[in-house]
Structure formats: structure tokens, C-alpha cells
């Protein structure tokens, strides 16, 4: 669609961008992304990032208007790569914008490992510029924005786990709230699956808790495709005091190359007696 737009819009990029902006509908009445109505703006965002890279001001202003109707999270990355300083300055201003969609762009667009889009290796190496933006959004009143903050930190944790844990420890002390507790849990989800000791400790789990697992039973040790399997096991604490534990289990899935890869699932979160 963006290529077709290019065929029919004026060759002058500023004129073309203005036509696209003028054609945008009103900003959403709600403050969350839902449904598919906004997807019509997706090819327009792509047009800007594909054909407007040499006109920073026009492109950034157009993406700002478009992201308030959909999201320019993938397209802003093109400008982060070519104009890192100017684009990050712009994103910092968005953290104070009235539109939650614009504020979300500041976080979502800087995710080092944003799904469906190319990674930002400079932020994988050094996430501090991103964290400076997240600092301004950590107590945002909008859940959509806070979710983006947590997802961004989850991305960062895959390359810089200790920085994320240290950041969340600081936030927990400086801005304690139920909303912050939610951000911490959501941001640490990958590290918790890995059993990262500091992440477990931040969530209130003792990574060195002494437990035993026994009486493992399978209803079928060789299930065929389409069949169900039930399993059970017993977890006992060997501590002298009650312990908070989180129990996960792994299922290994066969990949096309013949190798198996594990996926972690949650079984239970319990307080168990000695």
C-alpha cells in the first residue's frame, strides 16, 4: 500500500506527507489500543519512514500525528538509527505529551528487541539512553504506557539483566505503588523464567530456598498427537520457616530442524510450611 501511495502522491515529499496527515481521522476517543481500526494508518507510517528519511522535521511531525491514531513504533526506529541524538530528544519531549499514544511511542519505539522489527543493537549494548526515557514514564497514569515500559525493560533484561534489576530496585524504593509492583513483575518475567537470583529476590523469593520434589506421576509417558497428559508432583520445604515459592515446568517442543527447545510454563505460586 505504501508503494502504491508513492506512485500516486506528489513527488515532493513535504506535499505528500501533508496530504497523508490531512487525511487522518480524529484521534481515538479511548486511551488504549484495541481493534483494527487504526491499521489503515500503518502503510502511511511506512511511507514516511521509507521515503522521508532525508527530511527529519517533516517526517517526525507526520509520525507524531500518525502515532496518535495507530502507532509509529516500528517506523521511528529508522530515524533513531540515522538521527540518534535528534530523535531521542524528540522522544524525550513525547514523555510529557497529552496523548498516551505519543507517550507510548517514546517507550515502545526504543525497545531494543521490538517484535516484528529490526533490533536496535546500540541499545542492546548500552540501554542507559532508553532507561532515561523510561524513568519519565514509570509512573504514567495510563496502563498502556506502563505496559510498554515493562515490555521495554523485559527486552533490555535479555542483554543487560543486572541493569534492569538495579533499575527496578531503585524504582521500587523511590516510587512504591501497586502499579510499580505490576511493572516489576511484568518486566522481570523472562528473568524469572530463567531463575535469575536477583530477580527472584526482588520479587520476594529466596533463590536459595531448600525444597525437594518427589512423587512425580505421569498419566501417559508416551502421548500421541491429540492426546492429553496429566502430571502431578509433591514439593516439600526443608526450611525451618514458611517459604514463598514459584513452581515452573518445562515442555520441550520439536522444531523443524529436529532439535527440541524448551518452553517455560507457570504451575503455581505458593507459601509452603516447613
Residue ranges and their predicted role:
Residues 206-212, 223-224, 229, 236-274:
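Contiguous segments within soluble domain cores/interaction surfaces
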Amino acid at each position: 500500500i505504501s508503494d502504491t501511495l508513492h506512485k500516486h502522491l506528489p513527488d515532493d515529499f513535504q506535499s505528500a506527507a501533508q496530504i497523508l496527515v490531512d487525511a487522518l481521522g480524529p484521534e481515538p476517543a479511548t486511551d488504549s489500543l484495541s481493534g483494527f481500526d487504526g491499521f489503515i494508518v500503518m502503510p502511511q507510517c511506512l511511507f514516511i519512514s521509507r521515503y522521508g528519511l532525508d527530511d527529519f522535521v517533516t517526517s517526525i511531525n507526520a509520525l507524531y500525528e500518525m502515532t496518535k491514531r495507530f502507532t509509529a513504533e516500528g517506523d521511528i526506529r529508522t530515524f533513531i538509527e540515522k538521527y540518534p541524538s535528534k530523535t531521542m530528544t524528540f522522544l524525550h519531549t513525547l514523555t510529557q505529551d497529552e496523548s498516551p499514544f505519543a507517550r507510548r511511542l517514546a517507550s515502545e519505539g526504543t525497545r531494543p528487541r521490538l517484535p516484528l522489527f529490526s533490533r536496535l543493537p546500540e541499545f542492546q549494548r548500552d540501554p542507559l539512553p532508553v532507561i532515561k526515557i523510561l524513568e519519565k514514564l514509570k509512573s504514567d497514569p495510563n496502563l498502556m504506557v506502563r505496559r510498554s515500559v515493562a515490555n521495554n525493560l523485559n527486552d533490555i533484561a535479555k542483554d543487560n539483566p543486572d541493569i534492569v534489576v538495579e533499575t527496578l530496585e531503585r524504582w521500587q524504593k523511590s516510587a512504591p505503588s501497586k502499579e510499580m509492583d505490576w511493572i516489576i513483575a511484568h518486566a522481570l518475567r523472562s528473568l524469572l523464567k530463567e531463575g535469575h537470583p536477583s530477580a527472584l529476590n526482588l520479587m520476594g523469593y529466596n533463590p536459595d530456598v531448600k525444597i525437594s520434589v518427589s512423587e512425580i506421576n505421569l498419566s501417559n509417558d508416551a502421548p500421541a498427537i491429540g492426546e492429553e497428559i496429566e502430571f502431578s508432583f509433591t514439593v516439600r520445604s526443608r526450611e525451618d520457616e514458611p517459604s514463598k515459592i514459584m513452581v515452573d515446568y518445562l515442555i520441550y517442543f520439536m522444531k523443524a530442524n529436529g532439535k527440541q527447545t524448551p518452553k517455560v510454563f507457570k504451575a503455581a505460586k505458593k507459601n509452603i510450611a516447613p
